[in-house]
């Protein structure tokens, strides 16, 4: 998405009376890592120009799908929405996380992954990275409302992917899909060398129709509150246009969105690269977005202390990702403050190849492709999982 000019921003002080800080939300926000954001951005760049329907575009689609599977989502949670552009087939990717109380009411979190004229690390590798990191962190978090993480294609050719999804899925569902809010994240990479400490929050001011404007204004004010509550960024209020929330807006849905405040001139050019944007800004945008998505979907607010989280429960929550992996694996458990555990990797014969103490990132670059066993030990409890290394 490229904005031709920036709306005269309203500098307003948002009261937190309607929204209070939730420690459980912050604990999950704190699971966001700069290393993950950097990896997503640089991997996204390797696919080059991802023009809708191109081989690079399809390769990026497969990369996204494999990311979700590596996070631990099942194939049944992933769906595809295909359409044809210029004689080539291209696909939207939809990951659905079912809500515990309102399984048929959806919070849609979306952003496009197609690019034109360049690798599009800002437009929209940045939004893609934010969505990936949120999906990773929320994988095992109960939410009252269902969440759909959607990676759209065809945005750069006139919002074709999102329009196709509205036509063939949202309106084709019987009864019509019930959407609580659409939260679009597009071009949130900022500008290298500038102070990127503000994120633009976009509300619906379109009068065709106007019946969803008031609700959009309310939800965008909530979004701004979440920016202040869960990130170091400052919110800036503006208006929505020219990105994948617009087909939903025209359909009468409630929309909101993120867009960079310092607007880059690099999108839609070969210069839309990692070097020309600000990965730390993307990291901070992810924090703000994750706080907001938890609020919109009403995430579980339970927090566990070390005493409330016995070793067996910690081990039950063990996640090892990516899996399959190549050079590194990450270890994640329910108690993110745990500092006393051991981890080893053995081959099929039981020979210990890697032994680690209290490490959350394990170097496996020296291991050959194959099947291995990873064992985590906490006090007197052990859990073993199979991992696959693929070079």
Labelled PLM ranges:
Residues 39-98:
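A non-catalytic alpha/beta surface segment that caps or lines the substrate-entry region
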Residues 49-52, 82-88, 99-102, 113-118, ...:
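Solvent-exposed loop/turn segments at secondary-structure junctions
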Residues 36-45, 77-80, 92-96, 106-111, ...:
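Structural recognition of the beta-strand scaffold that forms the well-ordered cores
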Residues 310-321, 325-391:
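C-terminal outer-membrane/trafficking sorting elements
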Residues 115-212:
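Acidic/histidine-rich catalytic neighborhood of metal-dependent amide-processing enzymes
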Residues 191-304:
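Active-site-adjacent substrate-binding region
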Residues 20-55, 112-114, 187, 263-273:
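N-terminal capping segment at the start of a domain
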Residues 4-13:
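Sec-dependent N-terminal signal peptides
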């Amino acid at each position: 998405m490229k904005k031709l000019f920036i709306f005269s921003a309203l500098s307003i002080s948002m009261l937190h009376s309607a929204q209070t800080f939730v420690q459980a939300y912050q604990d999950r926000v704190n699971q966001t890592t700069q290393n993950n954001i950097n990896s997503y951005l640089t991997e996204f760049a390797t696919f080059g120009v991802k023009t809708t329907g191109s081989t690079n575009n399809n390769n990026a689609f497969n990369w996204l799908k494999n990311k979700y599977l590596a996070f631990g989502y099942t194939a049944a949670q992933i769906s595809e929405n295909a359409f044809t552009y210029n004689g080539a087939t291209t696909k939207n990717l939809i990951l659905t996380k079912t809500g515990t109380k309102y399984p048929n009411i959806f919070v849609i979190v979306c952003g496009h992954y197609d690019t034109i004229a360049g690798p599009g690390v800002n437009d929209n590798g940045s939004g893609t990275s934010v969505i990936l990191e949120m999906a990773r962190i929320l994988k095992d978090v109960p939410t009252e409302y269902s969440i759909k993480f959607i990676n759209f294609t065809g945005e750069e050719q006139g919002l074709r992917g999102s329009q196709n999804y509205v036509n063939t899925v949202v309106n084709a569902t019987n009864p019509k899909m019930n959407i609580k809010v659409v939260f679009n994240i597009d071009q949130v990479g900022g500008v290298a060398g500038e102070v990127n400490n503000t994120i633009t929050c976009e509300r619906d001011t379109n009068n065709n129709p106007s019946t969803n404007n008031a609700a959009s204004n309310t939800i965008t004010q909530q979004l701004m509150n979440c920016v202040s509550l869960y990130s170091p960024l400052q919110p800036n209020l503006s208006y929505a246009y020219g990105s994948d929330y617009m087909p939903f807006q025209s359909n009468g849905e409630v929309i909101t969105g993120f867009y960079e405040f310092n607007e880059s001139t690099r999108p839609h050019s070969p210069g839309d690269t990692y070097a020309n944007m600000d990965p730390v800004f993307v990291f901070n945008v992810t924090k703000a977005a994750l706080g907001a998505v938890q609020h919109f979907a009403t995430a579980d607010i339970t927090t566990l202390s070390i005493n409330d989280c016995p070793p067996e429960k910690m081990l039950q929550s063990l996640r090892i990702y990516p899996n399959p992996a190549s050079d590194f694996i990450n270890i994640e458990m329910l108690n993110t403050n745990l500092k006393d555990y051991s981890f080893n990797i053995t081959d099929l014969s039981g020979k210990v190849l890697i032994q680690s103490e209290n490490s959350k990132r394990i170097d496996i670059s020296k291991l050959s492709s194959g099947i291995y066993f990873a064992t985590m030990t906490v006090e007197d409890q052990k859990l073993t999982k199979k991992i696959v290394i693929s070079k």
